[in-house]
Amino acid sequence: MPAQPRPDRILHGSIPVETLRFGLPIAVGMGLQTVFNLVDAYIVSRLTPDVAGPALGAIGICDQLTAIGTILSYGLTTASTALIAQAHGRGDKAEVRRIAWQSMLAVTALSILFGFLSIGLAGPIVAGAVGAKGKVSELGTEYLRVIGGGSFSIYFLFQLTGIQRALGSAKTPVLLLVLSNVLNLFLAVLLVYGPGPAPPVFAWGPVIAEALHIPRLELVGAAWATVLARTLTLIPVVVLLARRFDVMGKGSITKPDPAMLKAILRMGWPSSAQFVVRMLAMLLTHSLVARIFTTATDQSATTALGIVFRLETMAFFIAMGWGSAAQTFVAQNLGAGQRGRARYSGVFSAIYSGVMLLLVAFAFARYGTPIVEFFDKSPTVVAISTTYIAYMVWSYVGLGTGVVLGSAITGSGATRTTLVTDLAVVLALQVPASIAAVLLPGASLPRLWTAIAIAYCASGIVYAIVFRFVRWMDAMTEAHVSDVAPP
């Protein structure tokens, strides 16, 4: 009989202690994932100067584009794992299996859709929609075709590790994500540099690449490394789900269940749309900077954004880690009828997230210049990047608070509440303020950074108000899937 994680601590342990015990490994693991991504960016930054700068800019743009698909997938993960955690809290094992399998079918369909879109429309998206120019556009198109075409790997990785977290396992999903990034680092050195040249720290790479006849692929090699690493990591993830968690036991693998899929999509689309709204706001920033502050021969501002957005992703992912913990605690405790514990788990998750993000903000504020110079020593790029850091880092606490409390709310199934909240902040404040910052007389990058920082702070304040005063836990009855008859 496969071993099952016991929900006793989540349902009966001390909330401050257990949210810390469960959430800290997830938050640290998510943060480490972005550290590996920064190392990936370092590998690209050590290509020849005519390629390195545009490549960093291209990665920054493509990260935001591919994040749209990842976030849509994450919405399905958020919905299905909340339902799985609720069923697990009720002790309904058959329901856990049924929701898990149907959610994987939904992720499969999304993978096919975004794979075709990325391969077929990469050029018009990068150059036309975003407004990338010159070498950035050329490299970004090649990169997007590979990383977007292989998007199934990250969709399934998040979905399957999310199921493990919903069942009460915090450390194993983190270790698997770290494994994926270690593989990514190893493969990136081989595929980006090929037989050489390579920086001294990666001198082992060209030796292996030459022995295996691996060509020098430069930026597109980084994309292939990422897709291959994630795909290889799926193997132990599937084995663990089948053997340890017994999710793929007898009777769980069935044909598509329209009623179940509809229930998952009904709950998941607002969560997806919520994060897509956030990502579109970041893409708007990229587009405004690319169109107004760059030329065909000088893409320094785009390169700078490519660097600082990767740093910002660390703060966002740490918050998402605490948010995942909050969602699991809220869902399982609501499933067991413990509303008070559900609410306090969200509060403590937000507090722990805020403390971690203050430490991150201090580190970036103190060491911002050497961090940026680690990737690009160009004076213009360094100046733009460090100005962004100075204006933005302390607002990450507000951004993280919004992410964590929003995730806690989605644990109850109230995904429409989080969607409306994000729409209000982004459409009523961030978008108009960003556009005004660059279109009104005296347009400047610092004014744009100020507008975004204010929006991040507002997000945390608004979510705190919603979490405290809106009756979001009442959505639990609407999200209950047990009323959907099994086939």
Protein language model features and the residues they cover:
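Transmembrane helical elements of multi-pass membrane transporters/channels
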Residues: 21-44, 146, 157, 229-233, ...
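Short runs within selected transmembrane alpha-helices of multi-pass transporters and secretion channels
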Residues: 74-77, 146-165, 173-181, 222-237, ...
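Residue-level signal for short hydrophobic patches within transmembrane helices
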Residues: 12, 16-35, 39, 65-72, ...
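Transmembrane alpha-helix boundary and packing residues in multipass membrane permease domains
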Residues: 26, 30, 42, 82, ...
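Helix-terminus/linker motif at the lipid-water interface of multi-pass membrane proteins
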Residues: 31, 35-57, 126-134, 190-194, ...
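Small-residue hotspots at the loop-to-helix junctions and early N-terminal turns
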Residues: 53-64, 140, 144, 297-314, ...
